């Protein structure tokens, strides 16, 4: 059996001087994202898609922003926790396709490192993870430079599914 999950996250930019973390990578920019955690929208979208694929709810259910235990937390920790939940159900990650949506900063110099972090955290080969970036041609909140969004599709399979 295989299943697919879709994840999405968006955050507005926060105060000047805060770090911008995307895919576990600190991306040079004058402002990071305002959030309860580290605001890593890419990790959040992938985590949300992973949980959704396994029928395990969503990011906010497992890691609520009302819980101080997650204040400022590295979102890679959340992804690894979600992976363990999914694996406990007999699933494994097949592949991930994720998109960052932002007018600025330029993401392309960093997508390789983001892909590598996601692959390591999901315990898959880098070839099983794709990260890309796009703009909205100056439309909507990302286009106006107000924040960044990310979306992801995650394919999972039952252990042994492709071994037949």
Swiss-Prot record:
Name any cofactors this protein relies on.
a divalent metal cation
Q: Pfam families, alphabetically? A: YgbB
> What GO molecular function terms would the record report?
2-C-methyl-D-erythritol 2,4-cyclodiphosphate synthase activity; metal ion binding
UniProt-annotated binding residues for 4-CDP-2-C-methyl-D-erythritol 2-phosphate: 9-11, 36-37, 58-60, 63-67, 134-137, 141, 144
Q: Does the keyword Zinc apply?
A: no
From the UniProt record, list the reaction(s) this protein catalyses. Answer: 4-CDP-2-C-methyl-D-erythritol 2-phosphate = 2-C-methyl-D-erythritol 2,4-cyclic diphosphate + CMP
| SUPFAM superfamilies attached to this UniProt entry | IpsF-like (SSF69765)
Name the positions where a divalent metal cation binds. 9, 11, 44
Biological process according to GO: isopentenyl diphosphate biosynthetic process, methylerythritol 4-phosphate pathway; terpenoid biosynthetic process
* CDD domains membership: MECDP_synthase
Which pathway does the database say it acts in? Answer: Isoprenoid biosynthesis; isopentenyl diphosphate biosynthesis via DXP pathway; isopentenyl diphosphate from 1-deoxy-D-xylulose 5-phosphate: step 4/6
Q: How is the cofactor bound?
A: Binds 1 divalent metal cation per subunit.
Keywords (A to Z) from UniProt: Isoprene biosynthesis, Lyase, Metal-binding
Instruction: Give the quaternary structure.
Output: Homotrimer.
Give the UniProt family note.
Belongs to the IspF family.
Job of this protein: Involved in the biosynthesis of isopentenyl diphosphate (IPP) and dimethylallyl diphosphate (DMAPP), two major building blocks of isoprenoid compounds. Catalyzes the conversion of 4-diphosphocytidyl-2-C-methyl-D-erythritol 2-phosphate (CDP-ME2P) to 2-C-methyl-D-erythritol 2,4-cyclodiphosphate (ME-CPP) with a corresponding release of cytidine 5-monophosphate (CMP).
The protein's name is 2-C-methyl-D-erythritol 2,4-cyclodiphosphate synthase
């Amino acid at each position: 059996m295989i299943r697919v999950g879709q994840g999405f996250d968006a955050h507005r930019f926060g105060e000047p001087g805060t770090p911008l973390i995307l895919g576990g990578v600190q991306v040079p920019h004058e402002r990071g994202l305002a959030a309860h955690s580290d605001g890593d929208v890419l990790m959040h979208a992938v985590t949300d898609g992973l949980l959704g694929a396994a029928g395990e709810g969503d990011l906010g259910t497992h890691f609520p922003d009302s819980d101080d235990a997650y204040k400022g937390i590295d979102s890679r920790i959340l992804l690894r926790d979600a992976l363990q939940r999914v694996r406990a159900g007999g699933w494994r990650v097949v592949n991930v396709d994720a998109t960052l949506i932002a007018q600025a900063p330029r993401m392309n110099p960093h997508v390789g490192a983001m892909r590598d972090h996601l692959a390591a955290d999901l315990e898959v080969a880098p070839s099983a993870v794709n990260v890309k970036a796009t703009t909205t041609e100056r439309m909507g909140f990302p286009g106006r430079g107000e924040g960044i969004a990310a979306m992801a599709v995650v394919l999972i399979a039952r252990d042994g599914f492709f071994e037949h």
